[in-house]
Amino acid sequence: VEQVHHISPDLVDFPGIKYILENHVPLALSDRSKELILKCRKYLDEKLAQAETPIYGINTGFGSLHDRSISRSDLGTLQKNLVISHACGIGEEVPTGIVKLMLFLKIQSLSYGKSGVHLKTVERLIDHYNSDILPVVYEYGSLGASGDLAPLAHLSLPLIGEGEVNYKGAKRDAAEVLREHGWTPIILDSKEGLALLNGTQFMSAFGVYCCLRVFKLAELADIIGAVSLDAFDGKIEPFHELVQKIRPYKGQINTAARFRKILEGSELMSRPKNHVQDPYSFRCIPQVHGASKDAIDYVSYVFQNEIN
């Protein structure tokens, strides 16, 4: 079992995420990610110090207030207010497993050094992940436009000592849990609130979770279908490789190949059959399972890109 997973610029994939979650592998930033985060923050500070014109979201207001200049002394307050003002989610609480996945994906996103956050901010997110101090996030509030603003605001509240967390089976004030761990609330600097809220880690966490579940369900569907065909004393001919080549859909071809692999060596399958053909529900399995797999492949492709 991997002792620590070092977050790096390398692409993350579904098997890797599954392994980390199932084995409760703690996170740490790689040296390369630390370097990228520090470099980006340095660039932003230098850019801000030299700026003669407003930079949106950094020394200006947001949205319709984009033409409102913000003084240097108020830049941190602007970011804090942004987080607090967007923490307006409603509905049921998001399951803690999804929230932990949100944390992982937000950490991964910030680790690329493209967002301008301070290193300490990312490290505090890692502290929350590793300690299972999971922010309370609500199901409704995201439009998915410039990001999952409301859910990510709730995810970010505990960083600044606000909001609530689920910790050791109880919902508690974040400030209280932070004090118990000796963690000082983060004082957000320019652009940090914007970086924390802009992102798709809420919808992506649900998407990754669903993909991991459906990968397993698709695998089980093939196994159940193959065993059922065997028990029914069915025919293997509809699963022949040449049949699939007539309509060369990837999912259909792979499903038929998987059935042939599962049923290889079956005594029932190899004995002569007296019936002409099996029920349609058996014969069309490659087409039905295959179409489902093609859809799964597309959805997982989209989420794979989104989380990287």
Task: Name the predicted role of every residue range.
Residues 1-52:
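N- or domain-start disorder-to-order transition segments that initiate the globular core
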Residues 93, 113-117, 219, 291-302:
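Alpha/propeptide regions of enzymes that mature by internal proteolysis
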Residues 11, 15-19, 23, 68-98, ...:
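Glycine-/small-residue-rich beta-strand-loop submotif within the FAD-binding core of flavoenzymes
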Residues 151-260, 264:
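Mobile "lid/hinge" segments at catalytic clefts and subdomain interfaces of large enzymes
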Residues 17, 82, 86, 98, ...:
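Short alpha-helical scaffolding segments that buttress acidic/His motifs in well-ordered protein cores
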Residues 56-70, 74-78, 85-110, 138-160, ...:
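FAD-binding core of FAD-dependent oxidoreductases
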Residues 114-140:
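FAD-binding glycine-rich core of flavoenzymes that anchor FAD
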Residues 229-308:
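Accessory "access/gating" subregions that flank catalytic or transport cores
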